[in-house]
């Protein structure tokens, strides 16, 4: 997947799942499955339920994504 093709969207983490997977709720009400990007994993960035995150979605599968950023607040 080329980075230009990715769809970036904001969301809220609803629940934590095993293997660094998260259920993220998007503003339109959809819930997707997302995993942490490699850089966030390397820098030990913790994500908890309730955190606002930026998720990259592939145009081919809109039910799975990659968390690329956790908001400061």
From Swiss-Prot:
Its main location: cytoplasm. It is found in: Cytoplasm. One of the essential components for the initiation of protein synthesis. Stabilizes the binding of IF-2 and IF-3 on the 30S subunit to which N-formylmethionyl-tRNA(fMet) subsequently binds. Helps modulate mRNA selection, yielding the 30S pre-initiation complex (PIC). Upon addition of the 50S ribosomal subunit IF-1, IF-2 and IF-3 are released leaving the mature 70S translation initiation complex. Keywords: Cytoplasm, Initiation factor, Protein biosynthesis, RNA-binding, rRNA-binding. GO terms for molecular function: ribosome binding; rRNA binding; translation initiation factor activity. The keyword Coiled coil does not apply. Belongs to the IF-1 family. Component of the 30S ribosomal translation pre-initiation complex which assembles on the 30S ribosome in the order IF-2 and IF-3, IF-1 and N-formylmethionyl-tRNA(fMet); mRNA recruitment can occur at any time during PIC assembly. InterPro entries: NA-bd_OB-fold (IPR012340), RNA-binding_domain_S1_IF1 (IPR006196), S1_domain (IPR003029), TIF_IF1 (IPR004368). It comes from Syntrophobacter fumaroxidans (strain DSM 10017 / MPOB). The gene is infA. Residues 1-72 form the S1-like domain. The lineage of its organism: Bacteria, Pseudomonadati, Thermodesulfobacteriota, Syntrophobacteria, Syntrophobacterales. This is Translation initiation factor IF-1. One of its GO terms (cellular component) is cytosol. CDD domains: S1_IF1. The keyword Cell cycle does not apply.
């Amino acid at each position: 997947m080329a980075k230009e093709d990715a769809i970036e969207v904001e969301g809220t983490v609803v629940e934590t799942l095993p293997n660094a997977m998260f259920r993220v709720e998007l503003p339109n009400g959809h819930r997707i499955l997302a995993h942490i990007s490699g850089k966030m994993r390397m820098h030990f960035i913790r994500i908890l339920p309730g955190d606002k995150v930026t998720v990259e979605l592939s145009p081919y599968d809109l039910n799975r994504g990659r968390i690329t950023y956790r908001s400061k607040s």
